[in-house]
Amino acid sequence: MSVIGIVGEFLLTVLALYPIGSKNVNNKIVSFQYEIGINNNTIYKEDNMAYSGKWVPKNLKKYRGDHTKITYRSNWEKFFFEWLDKNPEIIAWGSETAVIPYFCNAEGKKRRYYMDIWMKDASGQEFFVEIKPKKETQPPIKPANLTTAAKKRYMNEIYTWSVNCDKWKAASAVAEKRNIKFRVLTEDGLRKLGYKG
């Protein structure tokens, strides 16, 4: 489903829950717009970064960028940093060193996408890697029971999906122009690399 389709589905959901003529329709739409940052300069930020911190590579020669500013934003990123640092098949890598401009349809403005990982393997092939939970790589599923909490969660998932689609479209275009492979790495792929969490 396209981003426009998902946002449209959200609006249909609001209209189904709050009939036309109800003052709640406009309140809900304005609330949604505020939450995703359409009418102000804030960006909606999820609170799923409970595990973050600074990280220092052991193989400084492999790292491209300022090694004193490496921040992992999840235990998945930390594991992948360690994997990149130890893996002899990876000759160079960087964290948030590739910045890709994109247009965020959810906010109606230009943004910058800081790619989680840029890496180069021993064959010379470069990759952009984004680390995401599997659930954020698929369109959100409308909850069967639309409680207030479920509606809010669903709206947040729609926003996240919309932003991810915009970022990944821009990243794919840049990658294609530069002969770089773009990959989204989920918990499934990390487990194949040895992640035990």
Report residues per predicted region.
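Electrostatic, structured charged patches in enzyme active sites and in nucleic-acid/phosphate-binding
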Residues: 14, 25, 29-197
